[in-house]
Swiss-Prot record:
This is tRNA (32-2'-O)-methyltransferase regulator THADA. Pfam families: DUF2428, TPR_Trm732, TPR_Trm732_C. Belongs to the THADA family. The keyword GTP-binding does not apply. Keywords: Coiled coil, Phosphoprotein, tRNA processing. GO terms for biological process: tRNA nucleoside ribose methylation. It comes from Chlorocebus aethiops. Residues 888-918 form a coiled coil. InterPro entries: ARM-type_fold, THADA-like_TPR, THADA-like_TPR_C, THADA/TRM732_DUF2428, tRNA_methyltransferase_THADA. One of its GO terms (cellular component) is cytosol. The modification Phosphoserine is found at residues 1015, 1024, 1161. Together with methyltransferase FTSJ1, methylates the 2'-O-ribose of nucleotides at position 32 of the anticodon loop of substrate tRNAs.
Amino acid sequence: MGVKKKKEMQVAVLTICHQDLETLKSFADAEGKNLASLLLRCVQLTDGVSQIHYVKQIVPLLEKVGKNGVCDPTIQSCLDILAGIYLSLSLKNPLKKVLASSLNSLPDFFLPEAVHRFTSRLQEELNTTDLYSYRKVIDNISSCMENFNLGRAGVNNLLKNVLHFLQKSLIEIVEENRKCAGNHIIQTQLMNDLLVGIRVSMTLVQKVQDFQGNLWKASNSPIWQNMCGLLSIFTKFLSDDDLLQTVQSTSGLAITLFIKTMFHPSEKIPHLISSVLLRSVDCTSVPEWFMNSCRSLCCGNVSGSAVLFLCQGTLAMLDWQNGSMGRSGEALLLDTAHVLFTLSSQIKEPTLEMFLSRIMASWTNSAIQVLESSSPSLRDSLNGNSSIVGRLLEYVYTHWEHPLDALRHQTKIMFKNLLQMHRLTVEGAVLVPDPFFVKLTESLLRLEWHIKGKYMCLGCLVECIGIEHILAIDKTIPSQILEVMGDQSLVPYASDLLETMFKNHKSHLKSQTAESSWIDQWHETWVSPLLFILCEGNLDQKSYVIDYYLPKLLSYSPESLQYMVKILQTSIDAKTGQEQSFPSLGSCNSRGALGALMACLRIARAHGHLQSATDTWENLVSGARIKQGLIHQHCQVRIDTLGLLCESNRSTEIVSMEEMQWIQFFITYNLNSQSPGVRQQICSLLKKLFCRIQESSQVLYKLEQNKSKHEPEKELTKQHPSVSLQQYKNFMSSICNSLFEALFPGSSYSTRFSALTILGSIAEVFHVPEGRIYTVYQLNHDIDVGRFQALMECFTSTFEDVKMLAFDLLMKLSKTAVHFQDSEKLQGLFQAALALSTSTKPYDCVTASYLLNFLIWQDALPSSLSVYLTQQVARGDGDRPASVVERNTLMVIKCLMENLEEEVYQAENSLLQAAASFPMYGRVHCITGALQKLSLNSLQLVSEWRPVVEKLLLMSYRLSTVVSPVIQSSSPEGLIPMDTDSESASRLQMILNEIQPRDTNDYFNQAKILKEHDSFDMKDLNASVVNIDISTEIKGKEVKTCDVTAQMVLVCCWRSMKEVALLLGTLCQLLPMQPVPESSDGLLTVEQVKEIGDYFKQHLLQSRHRGAFELAYTGFVKLTEVLNRCPNVSLQKLPEQWLWSVLEEIKCSDPSSKLCATRRSAGIPFYIQALLASEPKKGKMDLLKITMKELISLAGPTDDLQSTVPQVHALNILRALFRDTRLGENIIPYVADGAKAAILGFTSPVWAVRNSSTLLFSALITRIFGVKRAKDELSKTNRMTGREFFSRFPELYPFLLKQLETVANAVDSDMGEPNRHPSMFLLLLVLERLYPSPMDGTSSALSMGPFVPFIMRCGHSPVYHSREMAARALVPFVMIDHIPNTIRTLLATLPSCTDQCFRQNRIHGTLLQVFHLLQAYSDSKHRTNSDFQHELTDITVCTKAKLWLAKRQNPCLVTRAVYIDILFLLTCCLNKSVKDNQPVLESLGLWEEVRGIISGSELITGFPCAFKAPGLPQYLESLTRLTIAAVWAAAAKSGERERDVPISFSQLLESAFPEVRSLTLEALLEKFLSAASGLGENGLPPLLCNMEEKFLLLAMKENHPECFCKILKILHCMDPGEWLPQTEHCVHLTPKEFLIWTMDVASNERSEIQSVALRLASKVISHHMQTCVENRELIAAELKQWVQLVILSCEDHLPTESRLAVVEVLTSTAPLFLTNPHPILELQDTLALWKCVLTLLQSEEQAVRDAATETVTTAMSQENTCQSTEFAFCQVDASIALALALAVLCDLLQQWNQLASGLPILLRWLLGDSDDLVVCVESLHQVEEDYLFEKAEVNFWAETLIFVKYLCKHLFCLLSKSGWRLPSPEMLCHLQRMVSEQCRLLSQLFRELPPAAEFVKTVEFTRLRIQEERTLACLKLLAFLEGKEGEDTLVLSVWDSSAEARQLTLPRTEAAC
């Protein structure tokens, strides 16, 4: 947020040759006043900026000399030297422009001489013959033409020579480019030179005066000949595909420009160019020079790209303004359009598509220019209804969703221009009723809002015709647009459209209304929907609206802020019962109004719409509201409130004392946020605040220094600057105290991450002073031993983010290690790091790496390490003394390598011993970490590093050789049995030999038979195996028990491979290479690089373990990136050679190949990915093109079994390449061929091919339609129109159509066994993602219509799932308006009941299609009600004609079910269309037919005994749904409750089928819930009254879990007072016995039933407590049982649902059991329930914590507790809810007068369970387990010591305020003895820990530290109770905190916390 320093100008120094220098010296005068002296002084300077000052003095000096100096040899020589200087300067050197500007002011009398001198110097430049100097000459010619008079005159004089030079240079550069094929670096440079040469040629033609006349046009003129030569060169460039497309496109521009310049007469130019574009040149009618220069354009086959670039030249280089080319120009314009349309259907290469879109946009610009003065015929050709505009609109609609942003932007320009074109053609007419605009508007509004192009086009339309016409069509458009702002991909488009609309609307309203009343209408339209979203929208929606839309609205209309604040304040007041809530802002219990208020104020302040912070707090929002916002339950409210405090549009605005207090309050409760996004925002906002403090402190400091009475800032008048500075210092110190305290033992990852990030920001913002800059605070001053130790202990975190942040923070501080650690401690740290580097826990080596790097950079290594340095290095003498860091790094790496060498040697003897005792990957990781921190390009000890690098490479290869057999085996994951019995170790020799990579791909031909143990020939095996046996242990020389698991061996091996790969990649990436072997520079030789490449190739192509080859890929990518940038040509060509080699190997693959064809080809795709992804993207991507061609050829279907393996490899590699985002749009041209290969491969008889094809197809679906962004598989965000799809992939249109036709024909055939056609599955998967757009034109070239009949026929498939897919795929292919007719057609194809022969599969498929079409029609929005009802009536009549399919006449239950579903859907649609009146249904007789179906169904008659048939559950569910609808319909008739009801709910509930009971109960539950919540309009329907008895009976006998659960839910919804008295009569259980039964269910059933039963039991308990006040003691035992049930149900291991149920129960019973002024439960039980609340508040599940905060809110909002805190009735976050809960509990203990009884219990909470210390002891003494990744219950949110801190603090507050004292000391004797014993045991355990225990025994050390803090807290409280501490001493926490002390002094916070 601070002001950035202006970057200093870099100016290269000008120099001159020795001869010129001597000339200047000879002419310089003694006084130093002549021009030679001035130039001499200038060139002798070493600072370019100072030289500028001298250059500016040249002309004034010459002006003084006057005319007399014209003949002065000194002046002449100086002018000559100046010309040389100008031409020697680089193009970008500011001195060049300064010199040109100065010489432009040269007196006229010096000009001839200056031009002469300049011309001669330029001639010398043009004579150069060095090809690599051509670029400098071309740059000089270019600069001469740019505002430099002398340069232009010189070029004019030498025009012939200049043109000749350009011609020669272009020819030679192209030739050199061909010679350097393969050298990317040189070729890129040459291409750039070529491009500049063409541009300079064009500049010459446009700017040189000679070209304005006709003298040069003589055919024998040298200039003319050179021009013809250049034109010929440009023509060749245009068609040369070896050149970059930018060169070709610029050549197209140059050709048009040269033709325009050279052709005569100019009137014929349009006709000539038109004939060239249309390829219809009459060779006899064009000049000879044109034929000679452009023969290939006239007679040859011109490529599409060449024509495209000629179109670009035509539009860019010809003069279209004012119709200067006349009718021929208009004809050329139309011809160009038709050529572009033709090209658009041919060009599919991404870069050419981009060119095409730009050129088409350019065409529309040219058309506008021509239309401004055009003929009527052209206007007719270009109006909105013309074919050309129609084609252009189709192009826009096809490409407005294109993945390339730049292309989408061009479609916007085109659309905007098309609107302008139409306006010009109808000039003078009224725009809004214009049919073209009206039709366009309606079409756009019909589109779904997920289409990005809709926003862009609507925005253009609003700018063209205004918003009022659009709002007249639909007033809800602003709300509709805001609704979609939850989708991040649409947010920028939606906010831009809204901005365009509200600006246009405001302007319109202002112009229409003279009064100010218009603002109310504007607010209603644009602000009210915004406020609704801010209050009621989902989190994403609200966040995006705040970030994108709100700032735009407030910036445009700042006055709206007051309106918004007023509305929101009213809504917040209504929430607390002061006023009625505004309906638009939702219910009174919504979170929104406060959050919306904070968001509005935050944006307003950040954008400068608030005068000052003080005004905000005093006038707009109270301090209480700020605090509520800072601890609000919803994170966005907290973020917005913090943003309000931190952000300001003025970086120097003073931070007020109130703001600082609120920030401190915020930090106390908000560090432990689990959301990464929230953490990032908190840290970012606080950094902004720190920047404000730093910058405003500069202002205050200056004011204090100057003692100025004039204070520019209003805030400064309130107090003296020194006071504010002191406040700043205290505040920052307090913040740092809080942050360091947050690093306590056991603090969560979130807390540590937040605290360290904020501390890092503080260290960065308040850096150590430099120069005179004042720093108000320095973090260094607040670092002590304890804080240093806390930062060091962060290295032990299992999260690397925390380690990295701690390391970075320590690096920002001064040398802390030396200050706070003695040498013995440092030695211990180093030894701990070495020990951790060989730990079997993978994360330990990361800790070791950070520890070692810390010791290296702090120069805190043990002195003993110096033995690893030579004497010379150790002394540090020599010309270039090595840096301390380099020396330390070298020592550590040598030490690690020495250890590693010994361990590799041991691993060669026993890999198992290595895996169990010293896995080697940790050492390698530490070496890589040390190298990455060092700047390897500027090493000083090169001679020392060379042998180290060489040894490191050899060591890596050795290590890899040891572990590779495991990784390269065919089954690396399960090689060693999970035995911990050491006796089985003798068998491991055989296993390790067996795993050698001798496996092949012969599984295609035969199954692999494992040899019997007896027949193993160990000698044969050993002959091919590296010596990796465990003979040392087995043969008895040194028998060592070693428990090894497969997991340990595998982890050791694949991680070792991973680390070696990363090390090698790092070495290649960071180490400088030796240009030649003898060179003294560089550390890596060419041979070493090649060896590394071979290593990666071997392991990527042979490794089977994914972890190994994925990380090898990461290292290999680093190598390939380096090679492609390497100037060494042999290295640069290595990736290409490797690629050809592996492709050849794949092509030759057979079943005996060692390339892995299982595991998705293992590392092979990664290998090829790395080679292709590193290819320079700016080049032609030749490697990608050739590779894709080869792979697609291999992936195609083949009859040769020998080609199966290559086909599998090709499919797997293609999948990887299509998934690689780095290839971007370059891969798109191959998508169609890839899809063909996948679809055809899916029909292969070989399983492996089908499997790989499926994976490839999945990758292609993602590549085409995007990453899935919604739960719905067919989400609209992952679909596209058929036109867009087939325009992007036109080859797929005939392919898919043909394939679909083949499949449909086969499905319909009546011959033999049904063909299931696997490819149908893939075809339908693609087609169901397409849909027709209302914007599709009438063109039938890519129509989706031909697909429809084939998809319908696919619905006849014998495969059930295929029929479903066909039905779903059909829906998007049928336009909404055509659906009714299609449904009627489908229904007509169904058989009649009299037909003798019919196929149920066909019937089923047809019915499914009808159902899905009807569903889509009912969901559609854009239709009128009357049309809808009419169409549905027709469909109903057709449906009734085939009603036999729903009756018993149809023997198939599956088709009956679907037909019944259609009937059910029809009843729903018709009901909806007439708003619940049913005359249509009755008049059609549909209900009567439905009742007939139900009466004749098995629901009435029952099924035969043990009846089973396919589709029975589905049929029952469909029939039940229809029956329930019929019952409700009959019951809805007033006064006719059960008339015509064929079956009652009671009968349905007694059905033997759970499907029937479940659906019935679901329907009833919905009604009961609606009645219970008050949402039902008329309460409970009469049909459901008096059903209590039925539900009780059902509850007792129901044995289906789902039904049982719903019955309990219904009972829970009902009033217990109504049904509980009936239990004895109905189920022979007294209410008390029923309660016991309910609790038994809650104790024993599975989780969902348990949760419902617990809720029901709690409701029954509450009922008993409230109605039987006198007889409460009768259920005391049950009450205790219930309490225990609640306690057991909130344990962490239980499902979330169970704990949420407990929270709900506690919330509902809180007034009764938790906060009752007269407690019902015993104190122990009451406190046990409170402990449940506290436990749930510390749950790791966010949902559970949030729900538990509702319990706390309820508890602290009761009449007797609302004064305990300042946050009664507020929604708070769990972090502060924990503190508030304890505050309320302590207050209640005092109210109940139960402090004496409650205190021992609370002290036990403080001390923890007795088991905690037992765990500490056991963990310290147990032997470390061999299992690496044990899954244990870990809570990453709860922080034990935070709970201890809050509890301790509130107990102290309670005891000190109440003045309470122990009645008798004996009460706590037992506790005191326990605490004392615990202290003694802790002390003993600490002594048993090894040195540096925090690193080597982290878990045990942390447990002990936590227990120690708990014990200390308990001791302090006991001491306070005994009176050993003064009553005025208030101990706030386990660790004394001045920050907390200040916290309590904040107004009203004392009670809150």
